[in-house]
């Protein structure tokens, strides 16, 4: 058996994945995908700043991506009904390994959604809080607070993309607030 054939046999079918799903499962999968995507965009923004003197002017893109990441983290917390625990202050001290908090969060949710593993929501809340602490630390590195990042994201979404305060596929695809569609 070659590798591609093995993958074809072992990957879980879409039918099996969604067999027991509800709309809430789909929303959680959407948030999970968004977290991964935005984390990669934050990483790209950080790479572009490598070797550059950081100031408020040249960190706008990073700040926007941090806001987008927060959108999906809070959306996931809402889907698991742990928003209040996740947003409680004070946040834990940021760790030196932001990637580890992202991996822990996404792995827990992936296993819950796709492998039907029971999920400990307290453990998830702790993991998301660690993740948010790292977002806050990155925000501080741009001269902004976490609240500044949230305000910037809200301004971007409600002031431009979703002017009516409601999601639509059309508005999600017609991004007037971005010059490059990524």
Residue ranges and their predicted role:
Residues 1-182:
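Flexible "arm" and connector segments at domain edges
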């Amino acid at each position: 058996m070659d590798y591609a054939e093995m993958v074809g046999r072992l990957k879980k079918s879409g039918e099996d994945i969604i067999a027991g799903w509800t709309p809430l499962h789909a929303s959680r999968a959407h948030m999970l995908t968004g977290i991964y995507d935005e984390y990669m965009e934050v990483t790209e923004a950080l790479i572009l700043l490598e070797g550059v003197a950081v100031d408020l002017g040249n960190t706008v893109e990073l700040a926007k991506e941090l806001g987008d990441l927060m959108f999906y983290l809070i959306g996931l917390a809402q889907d698991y009904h742990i928003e209040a625990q996740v947003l409680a202050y004070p946040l834990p001290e940021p760790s030196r390994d932001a990637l580890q908090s992202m991996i822990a969060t996404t792995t827990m949710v992936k296993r819950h959604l796709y492998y039907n593993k029971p999920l400990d929501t307290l453990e998830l809340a702790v993991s998301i809080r660690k993740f948010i602490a790292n977002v806050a630390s990155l925000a501080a590195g741009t001269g902004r607070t976490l609240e500044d990042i949230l305000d910037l994201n809200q301004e971007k979404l409600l002031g431009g993309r979703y002017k009516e305060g409601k999601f639509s596929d059309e508005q999600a695809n017609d991004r007037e607030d971005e010059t490059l569609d990524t």
